[in-house]
Amino acid sequence: IANLPSTVEINANHWTSGDPYSHDIVGHIRGGIKPEQLDGFLDSTGIKYDKNRINGKLLLEWQNASKVDVRAIIAIAMWESSLGTAGVATSPGANMFGFGAFDSNPDNAKNFNDAKAVVELAKQTLLANKNRTFKRQDDKAFANAHGGLDTATEGGVYFTSTSGTGKKRANTMALIDAYIDANGGADDHLTDIGDTPSDAKATESLTSNIPMVKATVPT
């Protein structure tokens, strides 16, 4: 993202493992983050996003419902769809997180709006398929590309790219964290909120037979 710095100082207290790349993004959040801080970060990206579709208030609601760290939610939305401004995410009814946008059928993302998608992303992609850190997502994509991923025991991949997709998302989380520190701060420790997505309203009327992860044959 052109408008953001390439590196920032990492505060180990803000991550389960001491760093964003290995941070467990489900169930562990930095408390005290304010909607206005998230709005400020979104504005700082220079992306011309829809402020009614994604904003600090909604992001914190999605964190509460999905149990996914809000810093990770933003990072995913930025790299999947430039905050809803690119790809299938611009279609009516589709989501900005790439959920349901299978390589073979990207239009399937239209079955999940943003609120539904972030909860199902947590349930299916991150939890059921054991993709709780961005490092693990990268490691599994690499193993998948080289025929070494046992999906029966390790779960499916989140993405198939081996270009460091997870590391890019982790770096974005670090930028978000640093922006918060520079603009009022938040808790200097993590809070465990459990890892059971809880928003029944967000998950109603979901199609039960949607495949859990993207699946493509490596080239």
Where are these regions (language model features)?
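His-Asp-centered metal-binding catalytic motifs of divalent-metal-dependent phosphohydrolases/nucleases
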Residues: 77-81
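Conserved beta-strand/loop element in small beta-rich adapter and peptidoglycan-binding domains
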Residues: 208-219
